[in-house]
Curated annotation (Swiss-Prot):
The gene is nadD. InterPro entries: Cyt_trans-like (IPR004821), NadD/NMNAT (IPR005248), Rossmann-like_a/b/a_fold (IPR014729). It holds the Pfam family CTP_transf_like. Pathway: Cofactor biosynthesis; NAD(+) biosynthesis; deamido-NAD(+) from nicotinate D-ribonucleotide: step 1/1. Transmembrane segments: none annotated. It catalyses: nicotinate beta-D-ribonucleotide + ATP + H(+) = deamido-NAD(+) + diphosphate. NCBIfam families: cyt_tran_rel, nicotinate (nicotinamide) nucleotide adenylyltransferase. The keyword rRNA-binding does not apply. HAMAP family: NaMN_adenylyltr. Belongs to the NadD family. It comes from Bordetella bronchiseptica (strain ATCC BAA-588 / NCTC 13252 / RB50) (Alcaligenes bronchisepticus). GO terms for biological process: NAD biosynthetic process. Catalyzes the reversible adenylation of nicotinate mononucleotide (NaMN) to nicotinic acid adenine dinucleotide (NaAD). This is Probable nicotinate-nucleotide adenylyltransferase. One of its GO terms (molecular function) is nicotinate-nucleotide adenylyltransferase activity.
Length: 195
């Protein structure tokens, strides 16, 4: 059975930690592919700074040279408010899917629309600091136990990089060396994004 990882996000902009997490998940979980899913309009976040075409192009540049990474534009193509549950319901049958999330997302997972449906349809893989254990919220832990489901741990050393910090640096004209894939940094400079 094909195993596919799913990494959703605004990717505003995509940065080195996104790519490192996708590569780590592919290797550690034995995934055939990791699909990066850019949000159209994420309901729990501030409005996006870069347009969908710019974010898609930056993703294309970031995954060049990573043949097991792909872009899944389902949320952008659907438009409107972005809910993971809708994305999961639209997945084609056949593969085994793993939704990749961080410990911060795990803690608010039970606030996601139709979270039980998400957890019933796909596997959840949580990026944790090496040696740390997963501590899901009580409501999720109870649901997982009742449905004989588990969380998959994905050891991932945290990286001191965030899209919001990168946007602030770019707006201030500060350096972003090592935070962005080089082709993405060049694209941002060429198109004067985040200024």
């Amino acid at each position: 059975m094909t195993r596919i990882g799913l990494l959703g996000g605004s990717f505003d902009p995509v940065h080195v930690a996104h790519i490192a997490l996708a590569d780590t998940a592919r290797q550690f979980l034995g995934l055939d592919q990791v699909q990066l899913i850019p949000a159209a309009n994420p309901w729990q976040r501030q409005p996006l700074k870069a347009s969908a075409p710019h974010r898609l192009r930056m993703l294309e540049l970031a995954i060049a040279g990573h043949p097991a990474l792909a872009i899944n534009p389902v949320e952008i193509e659907r438009g409107g408010a972005t809910y993971t549950a809708d994305t999961v319901r639209a997945l084609p049958g056949g593969p085994q899917y793993f939704w990749l999330l961080g410990t911060d997302q795990l803690q608010n997972f039970c606030t996601w629309r139709d979270w039980q449906d998400i957890a019933a349809r796909i596997e959840l893989a949580v990026a944790t600091r090496p040696g740390a254990s997963i501590a899901p919220p009580a409501e999720l832990a109870t649901w997982l136990a009742a449905h004989r489901r588990q969380l998959h741990e994905l050891p991932f050393a945290p990286m001191a990089v965030s899209a919001s910090d990168i946007r602030q640096r770019l707006a201030a004209g500060a350096a972003t060396d090592g935070l962005l894939p080089e082709p993405v940094a060049a694209y941002i400079a060429t198109h004067h994004l985040y200024r």
